[in-house]
Amino acid sequence: MLFVALLSTRPGNTFQEGVARRLQWDYPEGANVLAEYWLETEAPRVVAVVEAQSMEPFGQIRMDWGDMFEIEVFPVVTAEQGMEMARQAMTSGQG
């Protein structure tokens, strides 16, 4: 399954603190990171695109980073997958 994680900075934390911690941290087992973006905003500050079989790796991410970030995780599909699903829905609806 494909997920997007949005990490928004909690008040009182600095970018420098986050970078120092990130340099020492790796994603948990079961999380295949496809992309990680650092934004020039506080909310969200980080966007990660992750493949995982379940939500389990995100529990560990929340434990590791929950003090510094508000973390939201959403299941997603690619634009190509979404368009294919729309085509199939439109075709089946034409009966």
List the predicted regions and their residue ranges.
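Conserved, structured core segments of small domains
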Residues: 1-95
